[in-house]
Amino acid sequence: MQALERDIDINRLEKISIGLASADEIREWSRGEVTKPETINYRTLRPEKDGLFDERIFGPTKDWECYCGKYKRIRFKGIICERCGVEVTRARVRRDRMGHIELAAPVAHVWFVKGVPSRMGYLLDISPKDLDRVLYFASSIVTWVDREGRANDIDRLRQQVEEEIRQIEQDRDEEITAAQALLTKRISVIKGESSPDELTEDYADVPEEEREEAIARARREAEETIEDIKRSMDEQIELIRRAWEEFQTLEPRQIVDDEELFREMKDRFGDEYGYGVYFRGGMGAEAIRDLIRQVDLEKEARELRQVVGESRGQKRQKAIKRLKVVDAFRTSGNKPEWMILDAIPVLPPDLRPMVQLDGGRFATSDLNDLYRRVINRNNRLKRLLDLGAPDVIVNNEKRMLQEAVDALFDNGRRGRAVTGAGNRPLKSLSDMLKGKQGRFRQNLLGKRVDYSGRSVIVVGPQLEMHQCGLPRLMAVELFKPFVMKVLVDRALAPNIRSAKQMVERLRPEVWDVLEDVIKEHPVLLNRAPTLHRLGIQAFEPVLVEGKAIQIHPLVCAAFNADFDGDQMAVHVPLSPEAQAEARILMLSTQNILKPADGFPVAVPSQDMVLGLYYITYAGEDFEEREPKALLASYAEADNAYREGSLRLHDKVILRREGERIETTLGRVLFNESIERTLRGYLGDAYNPAAYRFVNHELKKGEIKQLVQQYVERYPTELVSQLLDTLKHVGFHTATLAGISIGKNDIVVPEQKREILEKYEKLVEEVEEQWEAGFISDEERAERVIGLWTQAKNEVEEAMKANLWKLNPIYMMANSGARGSYSQITQLAGMRGLMTNAKGEIIDEPVKSNFMEGLTVLEYFTSTHGARKGQADTALRTADSGYLTRRLVDVAQDVVIREEDCGTDGYIELPLYLEDGQGDPNDSVAARYLARDLVNPETGEVVAEAGTDITRPLFEAWLEELPRETKVPVRTPTKCENPHGVCQKCYGRSLATNRPVDVGEAVGIIAAQSIGEPGTQLTMRTFHTGGVSGVEDITAGLPRVVELFEARHPKGEAVISDIDGIVSLEETDSERLVRVVVTAPDGSEAREYRVERQLLRPEIVDGAEIRANTPITEGSLYPHQILENDLRYGRGTTATERYLVDEVQKVYRAQGVDIHDKHIEIIVRQMLRKVLVEEPGDTRFLPEQVADRFSVLAENERVEEEGGRPAEFHTILMGITKASLATESFLSAASFQETARVLTDAAIEGKVDNLTGLKENVIIGKLIPAATGLPKYRRLTVTVEGYRADDVDELDIAAS
């Protein structure tokens, strides 16, 4: 324990192991035994001696002061007061000094008893139910039997037993004879024939008339007495016989439920005062510990391996499970008897505090109550043992002690939870670790930090891209130590203390110093929820008045921020390293691209788009119009605009670089602003001829492309300046144009009435056909819905044609600034069809629009969909967050580890998506070619293997290669690096558009890229409108979860398990058809009965199909694809591609772009594990799930030594299971099922090598990624004007 009190350099920790603690270790950790349940004295409010807060055990409550006050001040450091026995030291030792409780009887650790499966039960091969009965004193268990002694002495024992039975029978007969003799005597006394004695005096002097009755009574009593004698003696004989029978077949670990029988056996055959000690047994943890101590782990493991090798079915499964536990104990160095505790540790008091509330009452941690229960029961048990109380009472107290310790370790695991005030279950040690409020997630993975603040955000349109506005009051508080240091350095304050006072009083000098301090000192801004890495970015602060943080309009998209009351947090990077990181890696100008797809995220939106659209707008009749002026330069254009001789949309001809450009004045002014920025940054290097004059309307999409071109062509710094220019021009123009909305801008088309009347007639005709019985109700609904959809489209077209092109509402929608045509249609056209609560379309549309107003019925019809939408959004947010958490957990340790793993594996991606739209497959870009790329038509090599596929190169291929080209590329799923991914398999970093750096945490980025758009996905299951047979097809978020968890899909398709030829056969039922697939060589055939209407069109008689070909419509089951492919030796590629493509389908349906490689990283983690079928000579167990790379490494080792390697096959795991199966127990425990993970890890004596990010965050070490890697940590940073002997701001902050 003393070692724990020394400060450990966390960053030098290499690994952490976990194991079982022996009683001796628990006593070693302890500073003293807690023997009293008292906490603090209610009068003095000081800890009680020997109690749960005792200062002698846990250390002083005040720094450098003993309990009695004899020693005060630091100069007495380390002295132990001879009066009160308290060591003079810091009070913070009360956070790590432990105590212990010596138990009067051993108790079992509830995790190992009641965990599922029961580890103790597996070790002893006792069912959990029986184990429970023994531990809680309901049954007895035999711990040892002297089989040899019993066999040798069996005849003697039989004789002794028979002799005893004979003796009892003889005694019985004698007692019966005596009873009969007494009866005879009583009768003669009643009759007056003899004189009475003591036994017969009640029957003397009976009157004549009552003698008959008295004789009858005497006879009755005699019969009862004889009956009692017979019964008690027979019971005794029966018990002895049963005990003898039981004893003859008694075996160790046998449970005896009958307490009387066990006592009888023990008295006779288990006691030296009986017939001798032939067996031992008992109840409670003591008996179980005796059994555990007898287990020979080596022998048990050998026997179990033999059973596994020889048997099948249930027996083998059980043996495998037992072997896992036995082997864990055998190899870990943990002794199994340590699962039974003789002493329990007491947590340091500051981790279970007791604080006084205002009203003089106390609030205390639940643990104190639980410890008190243990101590009370333990003390009572000690007293009972000292008094020599009967077994029944002692056993009851032992049971209560066991229950108290159970409640302390894991309340509620067995039986009813112990409750406190208000029937609330008390929080036990396990609860302290579990869940969102537990130690792992609340205090280790996420902490509150100093030097941070939060405030409401407002827009700062005057800011530059890399700046943010920080309120003065916030800044002075955040940079306090820095300001104090400079005040002292400049001799504005004599010492740190007075500098602190100056800052607190906000003296005028402070503001000047603050300006200098924050110059070039970036701060981090964060908006919750931080869904991807762009949710935290660095900015240079600019001091602003007021109390709101100002942020640049272009970073809003990355933060998903708006100004309706959002708040953001500010954090100050303190050390020079942290500042350098913030400036170089996290500055907002470095985060223009979105890591999910590599496209710009800092793109002008809303007002800026409107302004840019307006300034580049030319009008429909641009071609026909005559130019109003010929301009020789940008300067002329400026003058003409200022004078008012030309307007923004006037057509002009500009002479530029020797060419005449027909354009508008607005476009000339726009291009001038851009060129001015370029010239200002590039200076003499600027080549105007290379600049492409923008001569088209700028809508949202075009602006995005423009930014994309800037990113590809110019350095980051210039890109941010160009973005600022776009922002300025956009806001400026939008303001000057004065675009706003008025009621009269919503123009209802005159043709609307005619269109509606036309369609009402058509609908009427359909209704008549239905009434006449020509069509079914489903057909009617389908046709009516089709007609009304057409009607809405026609009204929309009429409305578009009707709107003036400079109508503000039209411009907003057309430019992509805000809103959409569908919204304008609802305002000015018709709302159209609505859905009901089930998600089905109501066939009566809303014919009105919002301008005209809805009827009551129409309004009612609209409410269903609107409310469902609201509920949906709320559910979706929670589900999406949980999905992100699971994704992060499964991929958190995937880091770029090396340059090239040298794998031959690759995949072929089509140049265009095969989704019917025929869009380019963006996921080909940002990778490396794995083989030469050959033009399939000409056969020429277009690019060589190893080529870095940049965006421009990919776009060039789209133009020159035929559509059906397949591109062979490297992929993370085929990477052979055992601990992460290599640069070549990953490709380019989408966030920086450069080859990815070694150390980049690509797993986290992948998880964020998939999780962040999760909230945009729908929740709904699509209903097929009553078509029978086809199950509801899941879409949206539930479908993504279904795929990543590798579950059976809803609406699963029937697939062929083998390669073969199809033959279709009729069945008795009209609905069903029999599909038989026969292998080409006729060796096997598979039969599937499927619904006729679900049969896929390509499944026809004689068709040749491969395994995994779907026979019916629906989604495939990924496990089945993998199983079939492995049977044919086809590897995992088909499974990987199915998962990636299906996830992509969901995201593309919502218009979300994600690069395939992110999904591939997650899929790689799902397929990392293998199932060991036959362990050979390796250290693995049969049917053990292990990491593929560790099995391969072990096989290599065994083969070198000439042994047999393990046989295994890949398995697919859902992300939750894969996270729990990770090598790191810290990571798994902080994810889910904390108690189970820690139980298993402790038994196995697991070692956490701290390779992932999570486990390092938990122990407070720098993460082994990016700048946390050793090669980056050895860099030294020199700062100008920073002297080595300066007092550091960090020292000031610490003091």
Curated annotation (Swiss-Prot):
GO molecular function: DNA binding; DNA-directed RNA polymerase activity; magnesium ion binding; zinc ion binding
Stored Pfam families: RNA_pol_Rpb1_1, RNA_pol_Rpb1_2, RNA_pol_Rpb1_3, RNA_pol_Rpb1_4, RNA_pol_Rpb1_5
Catalytic activity: RNA(n) + a ribonucleoside 5'-triphosphate = RNA(n+1) + diphosphate
InterPro entries: DNA-dir_RpoC_beta_prime (IPR045867), DNA-dir_RpoC_beta_prime_bact (IPR012754), RNA_pol_asu (IPR000722), RNA_pol_N (IPR006592), RNA_pol_Rpb1_1 (IPR007080), RNA_pol_Rpb1_3 (IPR007066), RNA_pol_Rpb1_3_sf (IPR042102), RNA_pol_Rpb1_4 (IPR007083)
Principal EC category: transferase
Residue sites binding Mg(2+) per the record: 562, 564, 566
Record key words, sorted: DNA-directed RNA polymerase, Magnesium, Metal-binding, Nucleotidyltransferase, Transcription, Transferase, Zinc
Entry binding sites for Zn(2+) 2: 901, 975, 982, 985
Protein's UniProt keywords contain Nucleotidyltransferase: yes
One cellular-component annotation, GO: DNA-directed RNA polymerase complex
Cofactor(s) for this UniProt protein: Mg(2+); Zn(2+)
Cofactor binding description: Binds 1 Mg(2+) ion per subunit. Binds 2 Zn(2+) ions per subunit.
Keyword check for Nuclease: no
Binding site for Zn(2+) 1: 66, 68, 81, 84
GO biological process: DNA-templated transcription
EC numbers, comma separated: 2.7.7.6
Self-association state and partner proteins as the record states: The RNAP catalytic core consists of 2 alpha, 1 beta, 1 beta' and 1 omega subunit. When a sigma factor is associated with the core the holoenzyme is formed, which can initiate transcription.
Cited NCBIfam families: PRK14906.1, rpoC_TIGR
Function as written in the Swiss-Prot or TrEMBL entry: DNA-dependent RNA polymerase catalyzes the transcription of DNA into RNA using the four ribonucleoside triphosphates as substrates.
The family this protein is said to belong to: Belongs to the RNA polymerase beta' chain family.
Protein's UniProt name: DNA-directed RNA polymerase subunit beta'
Gene giving rise to this polypeptide: rpoC
